[in-house]
């Protein structure tokens, strides 16, 4: 603490300049100053380059000639030179300024390959060997050195020496002969039998091989250049085609927008008319409501009296409730007091328990400290014993050395004893010779005594040697015990080491497998994400297409609200007959071509309205292959229908020609514009797509005044329609291949626009021949059966049902999607119930069609007979009533459709939830695997620690127990944190999924609001 306070005081005393100088001096002393400068310069350059990269500033454009490869090679040469020479500052500035990265620096082999130096050449080898040997010099220095040596070797020679002596010759011929002789001597002598032709053939072969190699190289170069040219031309062609396609698409979009604007204007006018009618109805309802208000006021007076009585009863009940609530409050207060007492008790118990745990912890820690102290004392004692054993070993070594010395002394004593015995023999001989026996005996006795002493000393030394040898042979018991323990410990360590290596290898394999598996799972997750994104984009596109089709169909329904009267003829068309059955054809039907034209126009339009269902069928995510198959089947069906229509049109044309001669009224009818419009809409589905022009031709045709001219126009128009039908069928036969999605959507929109224009191009009567009718009459006369009338919708729905039955081979998901589409389209089907109600009301559905023919013929004959106008007014009233019923039914159908759409959205939500659940499962499995890997690593660390503890012979069960408890606590904390992470990830995923579902639901509601 004192040192820290001193440091703070010193820092407070120092000024900024002094601190700066001190820092500078410390950096300079440590040798960090240069590196800091280079780092700061590098960072400054990067910061200055950053606004250039973001687009704020424009860098100076330096005109550099040559390719980027050569620039990179030269930059890498300079960088290598700066690095080898140790110019760190200039290198740190050069890297960011040149835009060169450390990973992108060319190697020496790359540079040599770029300079096109042959790897087999001596220059290449010398450069490579020189770079390996001379690490200090760079590639640039070595290369320049080699170039200098190469040019020095090729210097011109000023002095020459002549080795061969030339003799003076007089003539030039002799000199040439001498040169030929020298060449003949120098040239190697070949076999005499070898001819000149063989040599020439060899030269020819060599030259041909060289020419072939050169030709092959030239051909390769020519092929590469030609292929590049072809690719460039193909790119230019594709770009031109793209621009053409974009221009056509823009024109089509402009035409569509204009048509939509016209439709919007017409719908606004109808809405204004509808609002005026509604205001009148509201006024009548208001008067009725005023009468009802008077009645209600009387009832209110009665109700007030009842309410007063009820209020009195209610006050009594409130007083009872108040008393009950007061009792409940008292009970709640008592319960709160009980809870507070219990909470206090719990807190006290928890405090006691915590104190006990702390005491236990302190006791355990004290025990552990004592155990550690005892272990240390034992270790000190063991060390002392080891020191004593070592000292005993040293004593043993000393005793062994002493035994060896004693053995040497014994050998010397033996030699002395032998010498003494010899001396004794010599002395005995002398004694025999000499006469002094007494002196000799005394000397003998002394020598014997000395011998005995020496023998005793020898025996004692031998005994000591034996005892010492026994002690050396038998080691100490403590040493034996320690040796046994050491052997056991070494064996255990070897076994544990082998087990550890096996476990480590197995865990390493598991880790690699898990890593590979996790990589695969990540790739699958990325694939799932990409598929989900693509599916969401497809769903959004398909919803937009659905919205457009709904708006178009509803606009057509609003444009032409009148129902068709001829129900039996359309039922015959639904069953597959082009012309009504023979039993249902009456004389009026045959004599009135206007009715026949209406029937054929409806039949053609009903066949056309089948096509936009491709959008609805393509609403499933995996519907590309199905759509291809459906389009092929649809093309075949359209070809068959085109053939049937050709036959039907021919038969109809013959009947019209026959009936025109019989009935004079048929000539007065207006031209068959409905039929022509229907046929033109059919021909508009050909690949040329001449929709707009043909519709305009129909809408802008001048009406002819005379009857003969009208008949000619009818015949000409019907003939042109038949020829166009043939052209459309032929083009359809050719275009059997399926179109892409963009073309499908465009074609379906073009169909809808063509149908809408056919309604706009309805005929108006000629002012010269016929009088102008009343507004109600004109409405009825102009409300000829439209393209999207209910019987034709029945035809479309019947065909869709048959197609769905044919498509039963597909998956259940697609079946559900098709069912939803059928339910969505069934809202339009019930619009065809009005003709059936009319039949039930007054028309006979049996064989004679006279009433139906009369009702249909009333449209053109209304200009001549005033009695028919009254019938039309009555029919109008009936139709208005039926319209009101239809509005109610439509509302019910809209509710059903909304419920169906909600079901579809719920299914989509379920699918999204399934996808998110799968994603969560994958993430959880990955997290579990990561946990397992962490646990395995912890186990490895534990095993290492245990081995270390065993090797140190200081195992303590309490320490192990405490370590295990700490590890368990760490694992629990890690598990809790991972669980929290998983929960947060799941919450984020659920929020994302809910947002996506809400966006989908919002999109669907917006679609519904826009559609109505």
UniProtKB/Swiss-Prot annotation:
Residues 609-665 are annotated as: Mediates homooligomerization. PROSITE patterns: LISH. One of its GO terms (molecular function) is alpha-tubulin binding. Widely expressed. Expressed in 9 and 14 weeks old embryos in metanephric mesenchyme, oral mucosa, lung, heart, nasal and cranial cartilage, and brain. Expressed in metanephros, brain, tongue, and limb. Residues 720-737 have a biased composition (Low complexity). The keyword Nucleus applies. GO terms for biological process: axoneme assembly; cilium assembly; embryonic body morphogenesis; epithelial cilium movement involved in determination of left/right asymmetry; negative regulation of fibroblast growth factor receptor signaling pathway involved in neural plate anterior/posterior pattern formation. Phosphorylated. Phosphorylation at Ser-735, by the cAMP-dependent protein kinase PKA, triggers ubiquitination and proteasomal degradation of OFD1. Also increases its interaction with TBC1D31 and regulates its function in ciliogenesis. Ubiquitinated by PJA2, upon phosphorylation at Ser-735 by PKA, leads to the proteasomal degradation of OFD1. Keywords: Cell projection, Ciliopathy, Cilium, Cilium biogenesis/degradation, Coiled coil, Cytoplasm, Cytoskeleton, Disease variant, Joubert syndrome, Nucleus, Phosphoprotein, Retinitis pigmentosa, Ubl conjugation. InterPro entries: LisH, OFD1. Residues 871-904, 973-982 have a biased composition (Basic and acidic residues). Pfam families: LisH_2. It comes from the Eukaryota. It is linked to Orofaciodigital syndrome 1: A form of orofaciodigital syndrome, a group of heterogeneous disorders characterized by abnormalities in the oral cavity, face, and digits and associated phenotypic abnormalities that lead to the delineation of various subtypes. OFD1 is X-linked dominant syndrome, lethal in males. Craniofacial findings consist of facial asymmetry, hypertelorism, median cleft, or pseudocleft of the upper lip, hypoplasia of the alae nasi, oral clefts and abnormal frenulea, tongue anomalies (clefting, cysts, hamartoma), and anomalous dentition involving missing or extra teeth. This is Centriole and centriolar satellite protein OFD1. It comes from Homo sapiens.
């Amino acid at each position: 603490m004192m040192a820290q306070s001193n440091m703070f005081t010193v820092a407070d005393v120092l000024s900024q300049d002094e601190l700066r100088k001190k820092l500078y001096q410390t950096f300079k002393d440590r040798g960090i100053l240069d590196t800091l400068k280079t780092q700061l310069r590098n960072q400054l350059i990067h910061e200055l380059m950053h606004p250039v990269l973001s687009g704020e500033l424009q860098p100076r454009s330096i005109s550099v000639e040559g390719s980027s490869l050569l620039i990179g090679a030269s930059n890498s040469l300079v960088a290598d030179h700066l690095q080898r020479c140790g110019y760190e500052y200039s290198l740190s500035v050069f890297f960011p300024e040149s835009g060169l990265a450390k990973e992108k620096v060319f190697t020496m082999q790359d540079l040599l390959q770029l300079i096109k130096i042959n790897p087999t050449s001596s220059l290449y080898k010398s450069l490579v060997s020189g770079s390996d040997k001379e690490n200090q010099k760079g590639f640039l220095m070595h290369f320049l050195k080699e170039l200098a040596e190469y040019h020095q070797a090729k210097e011109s020679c000023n002095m020459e020496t002549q080795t061969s002596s030339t003799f003076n010759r007089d003539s030039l011929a002799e000199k040439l002969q001498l040169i030929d002789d020298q060449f003949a001597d120098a040239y190697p002598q070949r076999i005499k039998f070898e001819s000149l032709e063989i040599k020439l053939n060899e030269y020819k072969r060599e030259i041909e091989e060289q020419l072939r190699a050169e030709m092959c190289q030239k051909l390769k170069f020519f092929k590469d250049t030609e292929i590049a040219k072809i690719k460039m031309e193909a790119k230019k062609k594709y770009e031109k085609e793209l621009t053409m396609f974009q221009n056509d698409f823009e024109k089509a979009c402009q035409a569509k927008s204009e048509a939509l604007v016209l439709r919007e204007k017409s719908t606004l006018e109808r809405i204004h008319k509808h609002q005026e009618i509604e205001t009148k109805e509201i006024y009548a309802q208001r008067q009725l409501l005023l009468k009802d208000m008077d009645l209600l006021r009387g009832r209110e007076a009665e109700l007030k009296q009842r309410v007063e009585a009820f209020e009195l009863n209610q006050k009594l009940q409130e007083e009872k409730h108040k008393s009950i609530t007061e009792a409940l409050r008292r009970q709640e207060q008592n319960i709160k007091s009980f809870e507070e007492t219990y909470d206090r008790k719990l807190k006290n118990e928890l405090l006691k328990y915590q104190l006990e745990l702390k005491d236990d912890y302190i006791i355990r820690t004290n025990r552990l400290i004592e155990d550690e102290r005892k272990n240390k004392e034992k270790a000190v004692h063991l060390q002392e014993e080891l020191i004593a054993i070592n000292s005993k070993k040293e004593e043993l070594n000393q005793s062994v050395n002493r035994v060896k010395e004693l053995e040497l002394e014994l050998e010397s004593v033996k030699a002395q004893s032998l010498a003494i015995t010899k001396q004794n023999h010599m002395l005995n001989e002398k004694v025999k010779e000499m006469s002094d026996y007494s002196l000799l005996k005394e000397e003998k006795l002394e020598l014997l005594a000395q011998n005995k002493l020496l023998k005793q000393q020898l025996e004692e030394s031998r005994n000591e040697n034996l005892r010492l040898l026994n002690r050396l042979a038998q080691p100490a018991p403590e040493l034996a015990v320690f040796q046994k323990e050491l052997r056991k410990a070494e064996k255990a360590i070897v076994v544990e080491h082998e087990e550890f290596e096996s476990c480590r290898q197995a865990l390493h394999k598991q880790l690699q497998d898990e890593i590979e598996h996790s990589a695969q799972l990540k790739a699958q997750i990325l694939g799932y994400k990409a598929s989900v994104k693509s599916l969401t984009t497809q769903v959004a596109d398909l919803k937009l297409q659905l919205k457009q089709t709904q708006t178009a169909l509803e606009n057509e329904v609003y444009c032409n609200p009148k129902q068709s009267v001829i129900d039996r003829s359309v039922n015959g068309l639904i069953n597959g007959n082009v012309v009504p059955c023979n039993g249902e054809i009456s004389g009026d039907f045959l004599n009135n071509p206007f009715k026949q034209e209406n029937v054929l126009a409806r039949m053609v339009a009903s066949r056309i309205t089948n096509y936009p269902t491709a959008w609805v069928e393509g609403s499933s995510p995996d519907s590309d292959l199905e759509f291809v198959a459906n389009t092929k089947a649809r093309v075949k069906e359209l070809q068959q229908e085109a053939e049937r229509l050709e036959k039907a049109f021919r038969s109809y044309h013959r009947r019209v020609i026959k009936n025109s001669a019989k009935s004079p009224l048929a000539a007065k009818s207006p031209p068959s514009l409905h039929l022509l419009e229907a046929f033109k809409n059919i021909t508009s589905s050909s690949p040329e797509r001449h929709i707009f022009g043909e519709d305009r031709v129909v809408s802008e045709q001048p009406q002819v005044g005379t009857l003969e001219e009208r008949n000619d126009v009818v015949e000409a128009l019907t003939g042109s329609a038949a020829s166009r039908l043939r052209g459309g069928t032929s083009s359809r036969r050719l275009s059997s291949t399926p179109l892409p999605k963009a073309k499908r959507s465009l074609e379906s929109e073009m169909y809808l626009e063509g149908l809408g224009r056919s309604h706009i191009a309805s005929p108006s009567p000629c002012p010269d021949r016929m009088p102008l009718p009343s507004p109600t009459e004109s409405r009825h006369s102009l409300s000829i059966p439209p393209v999207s009338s209910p019987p034709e919708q029945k035809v479309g729905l019947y065909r869709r049902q048959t197609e769905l039955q044919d498509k039963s081979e597909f998956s259940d998901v697609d079946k559900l999607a098709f069912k939803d589409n059928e339910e969505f389209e069934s809202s339009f089907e019930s619009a065809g119930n009005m003709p059936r109600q009319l039949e039930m009301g007054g028309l006979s559905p049996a064989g004679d069609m006279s009433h139906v023919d009369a009702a249909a013929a009333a449209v053109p004959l209304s200009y001549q007979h005033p009695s028919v106008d009254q019938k039309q007014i009555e029919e109008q009233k009936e139709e208005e009533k039926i319209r009101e019923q239809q509005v109610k039914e439509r509302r019910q159908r809209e509710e059903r459709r909304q419920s169906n759409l909600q079901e579809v959205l719920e299914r989509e939500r379920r699918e999204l939830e399934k996808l998110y659940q799968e994603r969560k499962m994958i993430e959880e499995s990955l997290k579990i695997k990561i946990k397992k890997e962490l646990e395995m690593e912890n186990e490895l660390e534990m095993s290492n620690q245990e081995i270390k503890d065993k090797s140190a012979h200081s195992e303590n069960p309490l320490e192990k127990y405490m370590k295990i408890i700490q590890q368990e606590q760490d694992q629990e904390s890690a598990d809790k944190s991972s669980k929290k992470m998983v929960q947060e990830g799941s919450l984020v995923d659920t929020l994302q999924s809910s947002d996506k579902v809400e966006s989908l639901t919002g999109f669907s509601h917006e679609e519904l609001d826009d559609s109505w």
